[in-house]
Amino acid sequence: MITRNYETLYIIRPDVGEEQLEQTISQFRTFLEEQGATKLKVQNRGKRRFAYPIKKLREGYYILMTYTAPGTAIAPLERAMRLNENILRFMTIVLEEETETEDAEEENPVLARA
């Protein structure tokens, strides 16, 4: 099974309690682990103000998850987020593989014209 690096950012309603916030975060962490995700890192970015109202709310808790998982794990995760009433928005992106572009740039420096 091919695994890729993913990053999922989701926003939780601001009116949830601290206990329910932690419960929601651990729910999705456990869900990904059950789907075979590895190298899972979860960052609580805290409560932030939106640029525009989302579902009549002006702020929310931003949670960022970075992980390696098979492609089949993403659709069930996003479906679970869509069905969870505490999640306002979510987005999953595929992270590019780490390349050695910095080393390549050093080997072929760009010459400036005089």
UniProtKB/Swiss-Prot annotation:
Keywords, comma-separated and alphabetical: Ribonucleoprotein, Ribosomal protein, RNA-binding, rRNA-binding
One example GO MF annotation: structural constituent of ribosome
Signal peptide (residue range): none
GO cellular component, one term: ribosome
Pfam short name (any one): Ribosomal_S6
InterPro entries: Ribosomal_bS6 (IPR000529), Ribosomal_bS6_sf (IPR035980), Ribosomal_S6_plastid/chlpt (IPR020814), Transl_elong_EF1B/ribsomal_bS6 (IPR014717)
Annotated transmembrane regions: none
Presence of the UniProt keyword RNA-binding in the record: yes
PANTHER family: MITOCHONDRIAL 28S RIBOSOMAL PROTEIN S6 (PTHR21011), SMALL RIBOSOMAL SUBUNIT PROTEIN BS6M (PTHR21011:SF1)
UniProt record similarity statement: Belongs to the bacterial ribosomal protein bS6 family.
Protein name: Small ribosomal subunit protein bS6
Taxonomic source organism: Thermosynechococcus vestitus (strain NIES-2133 / IAM M-273 / BP-1)
